[in-house]
Amino acid sequence: MRLNPDCIRDILLYVEENTGYMSYIPVPRNVHNFDIVLQNNYEPDEILYHIDLCEEYGYIHTDSGTIANFYIKRLSVLGHEFLENIRQENN
């Protein structure tokens, strides 16, 4: 699968908007039941692949959760810096 920088950006923006202290995003391991807003723009497999890359890059913190789900806990400092750099480039 190819790297899609737009997908990474959209995931990070979604995480920033939808997480908080003790407020996680459940992500089902069964991609066919994936109802995240991003699914309107990306295929479920592409979203999960890029969530994995976001974790690998150190942009997000996740928790393994259960057999059915894992959880996106929050953005990391690097994730916040990445979004801030994008916002500065767009101004």
Regions found by a protein language model. Name each.
Residues P5-R9, D45-L48, K73, V77-H80:
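Non-catalytic, well-ordered alpha-helical scaffold segments
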Residues V15-N18, C54, L83-I86:
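Generic structural signal for hydrophobic core residues of well-folded globular domains
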Residues R2, Y21, Q39-Y42, S64-N69, ...:
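Peripheral peptide segments
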Residues V37-N41, H80-E81:
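Alpha-helix boundary/capping detector
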Residues F70-N91:
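Short, amphipathic alpha-helical interaction segments positioned at domain boundaries
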Residues E55-G65:
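A short, conserved structural fragment
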Residues R2-V37:
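Short amphipathic alpha-helical interface segments
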Residues Q39-Y57:
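Short amphipathic alpha-helical interaction segments
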